[in-house]
């Protein structure tokens, strides 16, 4: 998927019907936090670590993961450059929710959530 296709299919917070994803989107990922790194992936990872008070396990291949009370999180930097890896994460039944922001992707393992894939701006 290229950036234009992603932009045309992507939704904003007003189209989110999952309370967990809406809260994650508005209160964590797009909060205005002073001191946040500039990059989208680094900024999202920094905000998640700060919100949940945990340090992520960062791998050199552009993936990071951590566990918290809301579940297990997996972040992928530039998932569309590694389309096979991102598709395998989306198809894996362990991950209930996947969030595709084009420049980074987030997968969440939380058995209380229904299985959904969100394409977001």
Q: What is each of the regions a protein language model found here?
A:
Residues 1-73, 79-121:
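A short alpha-helical cap/connector motif
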């Amino acid at each position: 998927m290229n950036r234009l296709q992603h932009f045309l299919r992507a939704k904003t917070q007003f189209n989110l019907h999952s309370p967990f994803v809406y809260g994650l989107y508005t209160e964590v990922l797009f909060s205005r936090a002073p001191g946040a790194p500039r990059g989208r992936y680094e900024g999202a990872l920094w905000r998640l670590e700060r919100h949940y008070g945990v340090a992520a396990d960062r791998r050199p291949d552009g993936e990071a993961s951590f566990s918290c009370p809301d579940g297990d999180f997996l972040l992928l930097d530039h998932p569309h450059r590694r389309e096979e890896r991102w598709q395998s994460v989306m198809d894996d039944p362990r991950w209930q929710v996947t969030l595709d922001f084009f420049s980074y992707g987030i997968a969440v393992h939380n058995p209380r959530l229904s299985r959904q894939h969100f394409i977001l701006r």
